[in-house]
């Protein structure tokens, strides 16, 4: 049986950084009684996963995301607290996503060091092979993953709540959120998703919901089998989710690995994305998780630079109208990019774009800190924003609703596909209906 203290720990872990969300606030109002009820449901095997919300995000590409209720997310954190330490002891050091002390930047630095080591400080030839998986999260076969996780728990977990953990893991892995969900995005947005990219259309028992904590944890666990097989034949390799790069002195070393990689993936119900495969000399540069690694230097990919330019333009537009709230939001976006660029060799690019895109009048609202490390709203406007935000939080209760106003590009694509869009307003909210032209 699960002890109350364990569930309480999972609750505090779950609400961290999420305390102001509607679900967390409602649960916290009576969190002790809510936790007791949840505990009783689990121990009596009456617990059932609740309705999820589902929406489509547009940036950086169209993706379907599911989010469980807050009480269900507590269960996800309970599972992670129990299994993550055990998984960590068996993960390869060459896996960098969603792990403490790792991360995207650490993976990029490791790959740079690997290239330097294999090429003997850029004095010898070295080759890189990049591979990606096709529709990774949506291709995961649930029964196989559930069995692998259950076998792992049987062998490695020895807590008093072992049977509860097995029962809950099987439930969350085999759950079909698409069968009981509330769509927060307009239906027409699903038209931009390929069938294999949605749980609604990719086939029975295929896919785990992007957006839930356990998805990343169990995905790492699933691919750890491939990590260790690659590690046996090729010491220098890095993986971030389903993006992998291998480095070797000779071409043949890398090419001989392809049959083994395909065979291992097939045993897991996965396959390579042939369109994203590349094989080249290190001197041509290596693209990995949003960065271009070249000799002694790391750059951002063009998409990131273009998006940074767009964020600076939005800041300039907000400053032109003197909208302090819009300026504050735009500054957050600009600073997120400046934070990324601070780790790369991009000082000249940052300086050039900011100077090109910001009007002279815009500078009265903010200042640049350090060597283009961040943008900061001037103090007198910051104070105004503080009190305005306090008033808005009182007057307007925050919700999890999302804006689904179609962009001009989306409208054009839907019309080309033979659909018609009808937009109308109910209770001050914009609604969009999409239907075939012949209906």
Which positions does each model-derived feature cover?
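Short linear proline/tyrosine/threonine-rich motifs used for host-factor recruitment
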Residues: 394, 421-423, 430-436
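Non-catalytic, polymerase-adjacent accessory regions of viral genome-replication enzymes
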Residues: 1-36, 379-382, 387-389
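Amphipathic alpha-helical blocks
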Residues: 28-51
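Conserved polymerase palm-domain catalytic core
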Residues: 41, 114, 119-241, 246-262, ...
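Active-site-proximal segment of RNA-dependent polymerases
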Residues: 80-141
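Right-hand nucleic-acid polymerase module
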Residues: 68-69, 77, 189, 194-205, ...
